[in-house]
Amino acid sequence: MAGIKALVGLSFSGAMGLTLLLLGCALEQYGIYWPLFVLIFYVLSPIPTFISRRLSDGGSSSNACRELAYFLTTGIVVSSFGLPIVLARTATIQWGACGLVMTGNAVIFLTIFGFFVVFGGGDEFSWEQW
């Protein structure tokens, strides 16, 4: 039952993050949909971690594959926060839209992190846990 509650909570927070992202694009005073390109970063961010968990050897304390995955994930997350700032600095979007998109980014990435904390705690990551 705890897995179901966690899944419902993660889905709710993901929906709230996407709502903030869409509000930053679709409100009448903003009306520009360029910030939706951060959706690409949402899709790309968990991929290095999935790959590193498949290829990792559990015998050593330092794992180069996992550290590279953390580095790539950090680059993807920083890029998703940088894109709205660059768009706002070039006057493509307004600063209010930038704030909404960045708040949505924070909520979505905390949701992705929460997914890994709740469902990825075992030795071998498995989709069968939920």
UniProtKB/Swiss-Prot annotation:
InterPro entries: Vps55/LEPROT (IPR007262). The chain crosses the membrane at residues 7-27, 31-51, 68-88, 99-119. GO terms for cellular component: endosome membrane; Golgi membrane. Belongs to the OB-RGRP/VPS55 family. The keyword Membrane applies. It comes from the Eukaryota. One of its GO terms (biological process) is negative regulation of growth hormone receptor signaling pathway. Signal peptide: none annotated. Widely expressed. The gene is leprot. This is Leptin receptor gene-related protein. It is a multi-pass membrane protein. Involved in protein trafficking. May be involved in the down-regulation of membrane protein levels. It is found in: Golgi apparatus membrane; Endosome membrane. Keywords: Endosome, Golgi apparatus, Membrane, Transmembrane, Transmembrane helix.
